[in-house]
């Protein structure tokens, strides 16, 4: 794909007949009038100069609507403080573009492709438009290969697909960002490929923490970061995921690499779209969301895919408003996913981390034809025991555990051990717990849970299973409590 010019070059080369005038400013919404026959296309980037003292800057606007009578309605990607009516606006003739190439790794960019850690860096690189079509259908290649993470609960019950779309669902404060950072630590280190991180509408502090952690882990050199955080206008938060995805597409299509794309948080992308939709005066749809919600989500998700011989593996954090999974924002995301990991407040309250709900999480490749008969059998037995334990909760709460049959008592004790054994020390939480993160190979995970479901560890105290790694850790913890495996 041909390179596009940078914003500065576009501005300098603009002709007088591609300029218009600001006629209305309402927050981030700017109406611009152009000469007849020179109305810019939808998604074109426009530039306006703010010359008001300390607010002086070049403002980037994106065309969102054609209003008729040579008027266009645009959304600003920066604060419009200091912008006044009558200011000249230049049509660049192109949509917003971001730098691509191997050199973007190790740096932080914003949604416009401007380098934040080294101002001016990347302006002379090849640029790609952030508005691109997904690969043609005949180039797509479905993947069923498992991506091993070393987290027991994930590898056993919700195996991730290499080249697939994975989402971490959860309400506020249940550990989505920590788990995303954990996956970056684990997969980026073991994966050895290129990673792209999109910070969409989340906390600036978390972005800074991630930057420092990646440097300390020596993974930053293989990672490109693109941020549009909470304090940014809705136009930026709506486009930052596309900017990061465009960089990832270059690594997939031009460099022929397998790429990891992390997005935190996909709900903020939807939320920004809702804000923009309201600002543009569109009639809201269900629960106040934009009527174009499914289209906008599809445009993003359809580009995250595997083509012949190369892939983009996407891991997305999804905030669930008020823990309501029927909310249109998370519900629209479900349809595009290969694996879902649901973080539960009830699991979190037990102190089990990661707080994954094993009964609510799922994966399309948890199938004997993909993961193998043994893995599938053990996973289904674990799910059966946990489901039966859940069914017995009401009886235990009302009548007490003593009223259960001997068989059910044994199952409950086994289920409590399974629950605790699904917890694990995480690398991202080392500074809080003082315990090093543990990685458990898939083969060992399957063997350990197979023995656990068969009752081989029924004599081991429950607390021995809490926040440990594999069988070696279990043996040490059991011995410290006066038991042997």
Curated annotation (Swiss-Prot):
> Which PROSITE patterns does the record cross-reference, listed alphabetically?
ATPASE_ALPHA_BETA
Q: Reaction catalysed?
A: ATP + H2O + 4 H(+)(in) = ADP + phosphate + 5 H(+)(out)
Q: Which GO terms describe its molecular function?
A: ATP binding; ATP hydrolysis activity; proton-transporting ATP synthase activity, rotational mechanism
Q: Matching Gene3D superfamilies, A to Z?
A: 2.40.10.170, Bovine Mitochondrial F1-atpase, Atp Synthase Beta Chain, Chain D, domain 3, P-loop containing nucleotide triphosphate hydrolases
The way it spans or sits in the membrane comes to: Peripheral membrane protein
Enzymatic class = translocase
E.C. number: 7.1.2.2
Q: Which UniProt keywords apply?
A: ATP synthesis, ATP-binding, Cell membrane, CF(1), Hydrogen ion transport, Ion transport, Membrane, Nucleotide-binding, Translocase, Transport
Q: What is its main location?
A: membrane
Q: Which family does it belong to?
A: Belongs to the ATPase alpha/beta chains family.
Q: Describe the task this protein carries out.
A: Produces ATP from ADP in the presence of a proton gradient across the membrane. The catalytic sites are hosted primarily by the beta subunits.
Name the record gives this protein: ATP synthase subunit beta
Query: In which organism is this protein found?
Result: Mycobacterium avium (strain 104)
Q: Which lineage is the organism of this entry classified under, starting from the top rank?
A: Bacteria, Bacillati, Actinomycetota, Actinomycetes, Mycobacteriales
């Amino acid at each position: 794909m041909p390179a596009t010019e940078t914003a500065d070059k576009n501005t300098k080369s603009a002709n007088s007949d591609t300029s218009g005038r600001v006629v209305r400013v309402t927050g981030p919404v700017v109406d611009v009038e152009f000469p007849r026959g020179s109305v810019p296309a939808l998604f074109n980037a426009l530039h306006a100069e703010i010359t008001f003292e300390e607010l002086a800057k070049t403002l980037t606007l994106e065309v969102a609507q054609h209003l008729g009578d040579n008027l266009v309605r645009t959304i600003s990607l920066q604060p419009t403080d200091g912008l006044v009516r009558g200011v000249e606006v230049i049509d660049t003739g192109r949509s917003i573009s971001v730098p691509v190439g191997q050199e973007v790794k190790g740096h932080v960019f914003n949604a416009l492709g401007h380098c934040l850690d080294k101002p001016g860096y990347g302006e002379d690189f090849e640029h790609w438009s952030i508005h691109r079509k997904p690969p043609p259908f005949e180039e797509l290649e479905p993947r069923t290969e498992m991506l091993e993470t070393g987290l027991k609960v994930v590898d056993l019950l919700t195996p991730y697909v290499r080249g697939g779309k994975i989402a971490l669902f959860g309400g506020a404060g249940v550990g989505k960002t920590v788990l995303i950072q954990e996956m970056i630590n684990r997969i980026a280190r073991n994966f050895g490929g290129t990673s792209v991180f999109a910070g969409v509408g989340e906390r600036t502090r978390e972005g800074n923490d991630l930057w420092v952690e990646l440097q300390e882990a020596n993974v930053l050199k293989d990672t490109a970061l693109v941020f549009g955080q909470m304090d940014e206008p809705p136009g930026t938060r709506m486009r930052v995921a596309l900017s990061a995805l465009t960089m990832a597409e270059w690594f997939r299509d031009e460099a022929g690499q397998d790429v990891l794309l992390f997005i935190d948080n996909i709900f903020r992308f939807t939320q920004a779209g809702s804000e923009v939709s309201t600002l543009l005066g569109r009639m809201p749809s269900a629960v106040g969301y934009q009527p174009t919600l499914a289209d906008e989500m599809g445009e993003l998700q359809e580009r995250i895919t595997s083509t012949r011989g190369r892939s983009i593996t996407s891991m997305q954090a999804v905030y669930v408003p008020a823990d309501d999974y029927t909310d249109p924002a998370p519900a629209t995301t479900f349809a595009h996913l290969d694996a879902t990991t649901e973080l539960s407040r009830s699991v979190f309250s037990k102190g089990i981390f990661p707080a994954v709900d094993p009964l609510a999480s799922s994966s399309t490749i948890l199938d004997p034809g993909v993961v193998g008969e043994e893995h599938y059998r053990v996973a289904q037995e674990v799910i059966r025991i946990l489901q039966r334990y859940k069914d017995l909760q009401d009886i235990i709460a009302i009548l007490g555990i003593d009223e259960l049959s001997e068989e059910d008592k044994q199952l409950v004790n086994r289920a409590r051990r399974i629950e605790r054994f699904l917890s694990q020390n995480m690398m991202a939480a080392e500074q809080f717990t003082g315990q090093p993160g543990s990685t458990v190979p898939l083969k060992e995970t399957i063997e350990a849970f197979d023995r656990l479901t068969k009752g081989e560890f029924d004599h081991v105290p429950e607390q021995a299973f809490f926040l440990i790694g594999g069988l070696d850790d279990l043996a040490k913890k059991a011995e410290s409590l006066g038991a042997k495996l």
